[in-house]
Amino acid sequence: MITQNSIPEVKEDFIGYALHERRIRLPQFQDLGPADLVTLTKYLPTSSNTNAINSTSRNGAAIIQSPAAVVADDSAASMATNGDASDTAVTTNYTNASIYSSSRNANDGAPMVAELHPLDKLKDEVGTFFYSMGVDTSGPTSIAIFLKEISEVISEKPQVWFGRKKTFNVARISFSTWNAFRRCDINVVVHIPGSIQNFIVDCNGESQNIEMCADYDLIWAETFVSGVVRSIMLMKENAEEGELQNLVETLILNPFTAGQIDDVPEMFIDLFPIVYHKGPLLGAPYYITNVTNTNNYLVETLVEIVKLTRNVSRAEIMLKNLATDNPEAIIILIKIFLVCDQELDAIKLTYDMLSQDKIINNTNNRMDYKSELLCLQAQFLIDKRQDYSLAQNIAQEAVNCSPSEFRPWYLLSKVYVKLNDIENALLILNSCPMSPLKEKYVLKRVAPLPSNNSLHLPLPIDVVLDEVTSLNPQDVQNEHRSADPMLVNLAASNLKSTFQLAYRLLTEIVQITGWENLLKYRSNIFVMEEEYQKSSSSLPKDVNKQEEQPLRAKRLCERWLDNLFMLLYEDLKMYTLWQTEQLYMDAQNNNHNKLTFEWELFGLCARRLGHFPEAAKAFQNGLSQRFSSRCARKLLEYCINERQRVKNFINSPNSHDMVPEIVSSRIRELDNSIIDLCVKICCWNHRWYTEFSISLLDCLSVVIQDMSLTKVSNEISSRYPETVLNLVQENLLNFFTTCTIGCYDA
């Protein structure tokens, strides 16, 4: 439920500032594009303002005229104050004022202002904006419903605006969303009271009425799909970072439950064939070099939606129909079967596609598709069957098919690690094609903040959980400044994209070999600096050729891998120091006098090195002092993995030695921890205007699978206030009731 306190806003210097900034940056948008933009024009209701609004609504032609046909009124200028010198709303004189730089004056923004708003100015009007994700963008009606809800929330009661209560009405509200397939902005403007205006703005800044387009329905289908892909990929791509995003003025809604008209997951599945061939236009995850029809953000989103909703049958029918003309689409179905625990079906389909090579022969990117199938096979053998010898052969074939792709090389190196073939693992890792310039999908600020005092970040008071919502950001900042610099400056924590994955492999290797032996392996297979300098100097004519042979057999270590060795050394050094200190403190029965932020950093360091129990203990120590969202998320991840480990052990041959009561007690303990952590993270997300989290849905589904929805709801009800239960019900539990086609027991 959206309230005044759940809407972050940025105050504009002049009406239309954010829209103008977005328009001039349209050519710079890449792949999935930016978050949606919502702009509002608010005013304090007076008799003159009411008359002006009513007059404008009667003259509808002035409102809905084509944006390109409107000419800016350069003489318009006004300054209004809402009774507080620090809260001054300025409609800038377009001929004199400049924004941020002398090269760009406010006259640039005048056309946009005139296009989206009537020329009559209201007294005491304020322009604000915020970003949004997850809104149903399937058509102008669904967007208008959302905008109307926002305007009613703002107007229903006095708003606490920069410390003062003010009764605002909304005169105009607009919504801009990026159609990633056509690289254009779709704009919907609602005039209150009045009409709805919707049009396209292309990368050249030219506007066109959508209703005049011959492919009207296709444009809205693409816009809807673009919005859903952005919402899902924002969470999935940043899962390792805890789904964090730094654009604080963003309202993130659940795209599955925010549908105003139709069922969003089902609509996405049904529309998928329409945009299938355009999927590569959206881009692909950071580890993919060659973007294909089956390896892109569109496909990743479909797989994630089916995994969450368990609507496998609908997706299977759709993909098999699609595969009639596009046989490679079966690869997507195989991915869905694998993530939805239908492994036998996935294996059979994979075998059929590889054995009937003619299916792949008739498609473009044949080797890429074959490599993708082989990678799926290898991943399955590594994770599920632990058949590393067979996985090694398959991964090698995948490398031969796509030598420029990172994933086949990564899987091959991982297999060698599992086989304890360290030399080959390092050689293959050194050969991995890295993508240093490709980043994960993150939100970026389109309209710069006009000033430090322009952010309006209300505290959601509808849900209060003291240990979470009462956390003082200033105290956290003080902790960050006081933390151990050696911990804070560990560079491995800043690794991105494929380097993050490569470092993970290196830590797996060092767990097997130890640091000293790893250095020996390194010197055996890579040319060390001293050897290189010696070989580059002039050699005597009578040098023994046999002495040159060992050096010739060695490889040059890539600079990025050399750097990872250094980062690994720093992590190991810090981990050893902390472990030694903890052992000493435990022996002395002394308390560990550490900050929560320091426990968090140490936990992350231990986690990077693969010491998961030690990492979990550090996160628990941090949470015992105050709430930390990162500690909570990483501890939640540990609880899920530990729960799965216990379940796997029960099904293993050695499980007969374990007492069933002990196993049940451990599972129950982990379930309680998972529920508590999910609730607290949900409250924290709500505090920062985020009502959607894939990781929380994933984690809670594990518990609901065993306990049922009703029991989980009762557990939350018995431990937390009703407002907290209602929040969790709305943001998490309702999803399992309405979007999972009855896969979870009520």
Swiss-Prot record:
Database matches in SUPFAM superfamilies: TPR-like
Topological relation to the membrane, as annotated: Peripheral membrane protein
Location in or out of the cell: Golgi apparatus, trans-Golgi network membrane
Signal sequence extent: none
Region (CHS5-binding) residue spans: 733-746
Pfam families cross-referenced by the UniProt entry: ChAPs
Miscellaneous note of the record: Present with 2070 molecules/cell in log phase SD medium.
Family: Belongs to the CHAPS family.
Subunit structure as annotated in this protein's UniProt entry: Component of the CHS5/6 complex composed of the 4 CHAPS proteins BCH1, BCH2v, BUD7, and CHS6 as well as at least CHS5 and GTP-bound ARF1. The complex interacts with the cargo protein CHS3.
PANTHER family: BUD SITE SELECTION PROTEIN 7-RELATED (PTHR31975:SF1)
Protein name according to UniProt: Bud site selection protein 7
The species this protein was found in: Saccharomyces cerevisiae (strain ATCC 204508 / S288c) (Baker's yeast)
Name of the gene: BUD7
